[in-house]
Amino acid sequence: MAWGWWKRKRRWWWRKRWTRGRLRRRWPRRSRRRPRRRRVRRRRRWRRGRPRRRLYRRGRRYRRKRKRAKITIRQWQPAMTRRCFIRGHMPALICGWGAYASNYTSHLEDKIVKGPYGGGHATFRFSLQVLCEEHLKHHNYWTRSNQDLELALYYGATIKFYRSPDTDFIVTYQRKSPLGGNILTAPSLHPAEAMLSKNKILIPSLQTKPKGKKTVKVNIPPPTLFVHKWYFQKDICDLTLFNLNVVAADLRFPFCSPQTDNVCITFQVLAAEYNNFLSTTLGTTNESTFIENFLKVAFPDDKPRHSNILNTFRTEGCMSHPQLQKFKPPNTGPGENKYFFTPDGLWGDPIYIYNNGVQQQTAQQIREKIKKNMENYYAKIVEENTIITKGSKAHCHLTGIFSPPFLNIGRVAREFPGLYTDVVYNPWTDKGKGNKIWLDSLTKSDNIYDPRQSILLMADMPLYIMLNGYIDWAKKERNNWGLATQYRLLLTCPYTFPRLYVETNPNYGYVPYSESFGAGQMPDKNPYVPITWRGKWYPHILHQEAVINDIVISGPFTPKDTKPVMQLNMKYSFRFTWGGNPISTQIVKDPCTQPTFEIPGGGNIPRRIQVINPKVLGPSYSFRSFDLRRDMFSGSSLKRVSEQQETSEFLFSGGKRPRIDLPKYVPPEEDFNIQERQQREQRPWTSESESEAEAQEETQAGSVREQLQQQLQEQFQLRRGLKCLFEQLVRTQQGVHVDPCLV
C-alpha cells in the first residue's frame, strides 16, 4: 500500500499544566509581585469555505477596573518608633496539697505562715499594666524603653509552657469579648469540663509522654475587637489583652488514684437538732435560754438512750469542770453469767446515765453540768476581753454546742453517731439534677434557702463541678474578702447515701463540716486554737474548705496523688511598638569627673532598660517636640506639666485582689445602672425642691457652713464626672478610643 511506510499516530507527551508556582525563598525578604501570564488569543480557523472579511472597524477593548470590597485606611507614623519585646517567666500555676478547689490567681499575693498555697486552677488577665508591675518585681525585661514614647501598637504574644515531670495540665485562652468572668467560669475549668472543651491545649507530663518536645508553644493574636492602630499607652494600660486559664489534671489515672481502692468519699453534716440553732447572734432569745433550748433538743427527758451522743474519747477531757462522770466498771469483772458490762459503750449504751442497770444521773443533771462547763469556760474569756472579742457561751471551743463531744467522729461505736450524719458520695452517680449550693450568713437562724437572705445559688450541676472555685468567686462577686468567716455553705444532693434531699421541701439545706472542726482543731489540723477563736467556735466556710476540696478532687481527671506541690512554669513574650515625638536631649558631662571601674567599659551594676508606668505616660506628664518655641518651652506646656502631681505608690496598701486575677464581668447596662444609682445617692443633679426636702429630713440642725461644704463637694464630684465624660468624647472624636467590651 502507498501509505504503509507512514508511522501510526502516537499520543502527545504528557506535561505538567502551567501554574504560577510558589516563590521559594531561602531567606525571608520583602515579597515581590507575582508575574502576570500573558493572555493568548487563539484565532479561529474556518473549516468550510473562505473566511469572511470584517465589514467594520473594531474598537479597542478596555478592561474595567473591579470595585474593591474594602479599602485600607492608613495612619501616619509618629516621628520615632521603637520595637519592644517584653519577655519574662512566671509560674502559671502553683497548688499545694489541700488547696485544689481554690483559684491560684486569687491567692497569688497571700501571706501564709503554714498550710497549702495557691490553687488547682488559674485565671490570668494580662494587660500592659500587669507587665509593668511584673517588671518592677524583676520578673521580666523590656528590650526598649518607653520613656517619652506615649504611643503603642500591640501585635500579639507568644507563651511557652515547660512540661512538668509528674503533673498534666489543660490550658485555654480567651481573646473574644466579654473578657470578664462570671459564676460559671470556675466550674467550666474543672478537668472533667475542660477535657470536653473544643479549643483546649493539653500539656502532658514527662511521665505521660516521655518523648517529644519538652515545651508547648502557643501564639495568641490580639483581641478580636482590637483595632490595629496607634493608641496612647495611658488609654490601653489596663486593657485586657487576653485571658489565660490553666488547670491541673491527671491524664494517666483520670478516674481512680493508684494509691487507693475506692472512688467514694465520706464527710459529715450537722444533724437536724441544729436546724434552729445556727445563728451566731442567738436570735431574739437570751443566751441562757438559747443554751437550755438546745440541750433539751439534744438530751430529751423521754429518751435516756439518746445521751449516747456523748460516747466519745473527748467528752471527759472537755466536760471536766464540773466533771461529767461516766460508768466505771468494777474490778471484779462482769461476772460468770455476763460477757459484757451492763452499760457498754461498744453497744451504744448511755454510759453517762446508767450504772449496772441503775440510773445514776438524769438527763436534766447532764444538761446542768454541760451548761455549767460553758459558763466556767466563758468566764476566762471575759477576763481577757481587752485583747479579744468575747463571743458567746454557746460557742465556746471545748464546751459549746459545736464542741468535740457532740461532733467528733472519734467515737466508741461509729454505729451510734453524735449530732451529725455520715454521708457517702460517689461522683459517678451524680447526674446534677436536684443539686443546690448556696451561702447563708452566720446570723441566719435556720437552714432553709431564702432568696431574700441566701446568696449565690447554683443548681443542676454535679456537685464536684459546682464547688470548684465557688468560694473564691463568691469573694469577687460580693467584693468581700472576709467572707470565709462570715458565711457558711449549705448544699442539697439526692445522689448521696443517705440522701441529702427532702422531697417535701427541696429548699432544705445541709451544713457540711470538716473532720478537723469536729475534733476541735484548726482548718490546717493544728490542735492549738488561737485565743480569738475560742469563743467563736461555729461552722463557717473556713471549717468547710476541706470537705469542698475532697468533693472537687473526687471528680474525673483530677490529680488524686498526694503531692506536696504541683506547678507549671511558663515563659511569655509580648510584642509592642512604642512611638512618640520626643524632644532631642543632649546631656554633656565633664569627662574628667566620670567614675572609673576595675575594667574599662564595665561596672558592677548591670544596665537595665528604664521602664515608665504606662498610666503616667502622655502629653500631660512630659514635654514633646512640638512644645519647643524658639528653643524654649512654651508657657502652655509648662503649665500643663506642672499641674500634674506625683503620688507615691507606698501611700496605699494596694488592692486585696491581685491585678492579674480575672475580675467579674459587669455588663454595660448594669454598669450604667450602678453609676446612676451612685449618682442618685450622691444627689448632684437633684432638683432644688428634692434637695431641700431631703436636707430637712436628714439634718435640720446642721449649720449653714456644713451645708455649703456638702454642696461644694457635690459640685467637685459633678465637675470630675463632666471632665471624664469630656475626655471620653475627645478620644472618640480623635479616633483613639478603645472598645468598651475590651476594658
Swiss-Prot record:
It is found in: Virion. Its main location: virion. Residues 665-706 are annotated as: Disordered. The keyword Lipid biosynthesis does not apply. Keywords: Capsid protein, T=1 icosahedral capsid protein, Virion. The keyword Oxidoreductase does not apply. GO terms for cellular component: T=1 icosahedral viral capsid. Self assemble to form an icosahedral capsid. Belongs to the anelloviridae capsid protein family. This is Capsid protein. It comes from Torque teno virus (isolate Human/China/CT39F/2001).
